[in-house]
Design a protein with these regions (language model features):
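Short, hinge-like loop/turn segments at secondary-structure boundaries
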Residues: 90-93
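Glycine-rich, charged/polar anion/phosphate-binding loops
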Residues: 6-11, 85-87, 109
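Conserved residues at the C-terminal ends of beta-strands
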Residues: 26, 76, 103-104
Length: 126
């Protein structure tokens, strides 16, 4: 983080630390490599499918927390924190950290976000 932006980053990290906990998401890259070897025709797709699978898992956990009225947000401080996380929790070297989800009480509603119009990003083809 550039020095001029660090105060904002520090405040954000403090808000995560004030939560009840953080869920860490990992992908076992040995499994991905094994599937690449077993199904060589699709080898280049397995890292992509791995990313998609972790995205689905992250979304499912977020939805489950939201349904329980627990606030959460998804963060990606990789690779900055990878070594520290692995050392702190004795994470196997073949596990790739893919995301962090701090969770806790909902202190305020989420701020509104601007999104691209659905008509510009979604197509129905008949």
């Amino acid at each position: 983080t550039p020095a001029e932006a660090f105060p904002n980053t520090q405040a954000k990290l403090a808000s995560f630390a004030a939560g009840k906990g953080t869920i860490l998401f990992f992908e076992d890259m040995d499994v991905v490599r094994s599937l690449q070897e077993q199904f060589a025709l699709y080898a280049e797709n397995f890292p992509i499918w791995s990313d998609q699978s972790t995205g689905i898992a992250q979304h499912a956990v977020w939805v489950a927390l939201a349904e329980a009225n627990i606030g959460a947000n998804l963060q990606h401080y990789n690779p900055i924190i990878d070594e520290e996380v692995a050392a702190t929790w004795n994470i196997p070297a073949n596990w790739k950290l893919t995301g962090q989800m701090p969770f806790g009480s909902i202190e305020a509603p989420a701020a509104p976000k601007d999104f691209m119009d659905d008509a510009d990003r979604f197509m129905v083809i008949k």
